[in-house]
Regions:
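Charged/polar low-complexity intrinsically disordered segments, enriched in acidic residues
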Residues: 74-118
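Non-transmembrane, amphipathic alpha-helical segments
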Residues: 25, 29, 63-66, 70, ...
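Positively charged, polar, low-complexity stretches
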Residues: 1-86, 137
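Long, hydrophobic, amphipathic alpha-helical segments used as structural scaffolds
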Residues: 41, 48, 82-89, 93, ...
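Glycine-rich, aromatic-bearing surface loops/beta-hairpins
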Residues: 107-155
């Protein structure tokens, strides 16, 4: 269940206790998690957060911290992706098969970006850097593709 909760954008407060954002895009997934827990013999308890500023601020900080960590991991993966492209160029591995593999890796980064963006409720600063880095990765792949096609045209 914890994987599904994380996928929803939930934050683990302590063992077995999670904070889940409410609203469109979250409610259906949360209902599914509750049903799955019940079907497995569990007894989920749902509590609404008190509407006081201190609790709201603390929860927002927890969600922001988690999203920043995800964006940092995403940015690190972007760096690894660009390093992989540079390594293939350095090795002269300019093949269509390699291009296909790198296109799949970029698509994985795009999916991951969309996933994090969907659960980034507060628009943390890391999102802007992530968007920029994803564009840079796309440009790097375009340059790699150009090199692959140029290599194919050489006798």
């Amino acid at each position: 269940m914890w994987r599904e909760l994380r996928r929803l954008g939930a934050v683990q407060l302590q063992q077995g206790t999670w904070a889940v954002p409410g609203g469109e895009g979250f409610d259906a997934g949360f209902t599914h998690v509750l049903e799955s827990i019940t079907a497995a013999g569990g007894h989920p308890v749902v509590l609404a957060v008190a509407d006081d500023q201190a609790s709201t601020s603390r929860l927002e900080a927890l969600f922001t911290e988690q999203r920043e960590a995800e964006w940092a991991e995403f940015l690190a993966d972007c760096g690894r992706y660009e390093a992989e492209l540079a390594g293939e160029v350095a090795k002269g591995k300019l093949t269509l098969a390699e291009l296909d593999e790198e296109e799949q890796s970029l698509e994985r980064l795009r999916r991951w970006y969309r996933t994090i963006r969907a659960r980034d409720l507060f628009g943390v600063p890391g999102a802007t850097a992530a968007e920029r880095r994803l564009k840079e990765c796309t440009e790097a792949l375009e340059q790699f593709a150009e090199q692959v096609y140029q290599a194919r045209d050489r006798p």
